[in-house]
Amino acid sequence: ESQIRAFLHKHVPTADEQEAQAEAEEAEALIADGDPEAALAKLQQAVAIDPGNDDARYDYVKLLLERGALAQAEAAFEPVAKKTALDARLDALAHWIAAQRKAGAARNPDVLASAIAANKRDFEARFELSQTHFAAGRFTAAMDELLEIVMRDKAWSSDLARKTYVAILAVMAKPAPKLAAGEAKGALELTGKAAAVSADPVLDQYRRKLSMALF
């Protein structure tokens, strides 16, 4: 009997988990309908009901960052901050949060561009410029600067340029469809992470660019 209870606990969603999932799915529909404010409220509720729903938390933090609500995003991200080594999407959020923190103190883009023009190996300036782009959601512009670093010095700053580039790809990727509330938890996922749907030509182009720079 104890084994049955353990199995059910692991594979059958609780009422709270089902309610949180329903809130998260409603949020997705609201985003598609162009109502991010209502979606934020739904996602906040989903995370409050089921703090362990990392998918809902990811969507919540991502939407906060898209709207520039850094302090709220940091607070919502804190409970999963130690999971970044295990989840590529959460790691991507950590990089985005770092970019928004740094962007607030970044030098003027024109100053950075001048520094880069004077010295194409001024990686500090390039990375700083990439962070301002990343923070503002200008993802391809950010990756263009990061790629220039990777092409010249793959290991610069403990591989920071490549790691940030990969994080941006993860932020841009559309996740695979979520499990319905009645489906078993623990369904197959790629290396324990939510699989991403690859159907975006821009994403594919920038993945190829990184691969060519690395190999």
Question: Where are the model-predicted features located?
Answer:
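Long, contiguous interaction/recruitment modules in multidomain scaffold/adaptor proteins
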Residues: E1-E25, A32-D33, A38-P51, D55-A56, ...
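A conserved position within tetratricopeptide repeats
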Residues: L8, V12, V47, E74, ...
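Structural register within alpha-helical repeat arrays
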Residues: E26, Y60, A94, L129, ...
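Inward-facing hydrophobic residues that define packing positions of alpha-helical scaffold repeats
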Residues: L43, F77-E78, L112-A113, E145-L146, ...
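Short coil turns that delineate tetratricopeptide repeat
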Residues: P51, T84-A85, N119-R121, G137, ...
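Alpha-helical adaptor scaffolds
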Residues: F77-N119
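Terminal, low-structured helical/coil segments at or just beyond the last alpha-helical repeat
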Residues: K174-F215
